[in-house]
Amino acid sequence: METKEQERNWHLVRNDNGEWISDKNVVFLTKQEARSLQIKARFSGKTLSLQHGYDGDLWCYKHEMDYINQKLIVMNNISLLEPGLLDAGHSLYQLLKGDLAPSWWTPLTKDHELYIEIRKKNVIDVYYYGGRMAEISYDRFSDGVVAKAHPKYLGYTDVKDENYYRRSVGKGGKEQFTPIYQDCQNWLESRVEELKENIRNIYSQSENGENTTEKFIQGKLITEGRDKYLDSEFAHRFHDQAKETIRIDMVKIENNHIIFEELKRIGDSRLLTYNGEPEILRQIRHYREFLQGNKDRLAAYYKVLYRIKKELGLPVPPVDDVDSLTVDPEPQLLIANTYKKDTEDRKKRIDDIERILSSANINYRIDNFV
């Protein structure tokens, strides 16, 4: 009986009145998050019942946080996705169709090691396992297609070379070097494999057993799941008056739902902490707020993106009726288990991660990736 009671206590928290509350109905907060939420509560006109845990932890009731966040969305505190970010009739897409397309374009679309993404303001990015091989855009002065690449992928890795990097001085007098992107059409024409090799050399540790990078895993998932994934690296500002940016790793389509999926490696420190709340909980909360406030706008955006990709002959998930696509406001978390050996500490880490994610009602799954 004592063991069962102890196990049960792991799923209960005590409020300031001494009452026991299920941890599924509460949200744990850092001191900074608590202060921020108190400010939001004042703006929204909602009283926040901030509670103090036995070990000094701060928490609030989930329904109070949900109300505050929803009220702030209504008040346009959450940045809204503006319309017109994509134009299916844009000159770039017209110039990449049929005989008008540069000779290097079609081979890129058929290269199974590459994946091609449509970006806001009608820019196209070409990726090779974590490296952005090329940025393709329309040049209105020449009325043509331009393709540029980071100089390091073209072999120019010396950041002090003023032909390829722009020097500036940042805070504290620290030197900064900004790459000057270079035309890479000749490389795309006849030196694609060399370009890939340069990227592999720069990311030599990308595929390295348990230390395989998140970007490599992401690229592998996309290139092997073209019937599921529609987009990657979606980014947008979170608040209109703040610099914080929402960045969600992958966007997929399942059962006519557009689903936003965050990717983490099992060893990522943001998944677990024994001193306060893991960062992943705050991250997922922000995703929820953003998706809830923008679900209709995101659906409209991705319907256009889907049609652009399909018209360009790029792989897209099968959809019977594009107009019926809807956005799932609940983000998903995919954890790549790169552990090759099981140890007691690793098993405990996984158990602790799952317990925290489950108690926070996060939709997650853990897949082996070795």
Language-model regions: role of each:
Residues M1-V370:
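Charged, terminal alpha-helix-loop-beta segments
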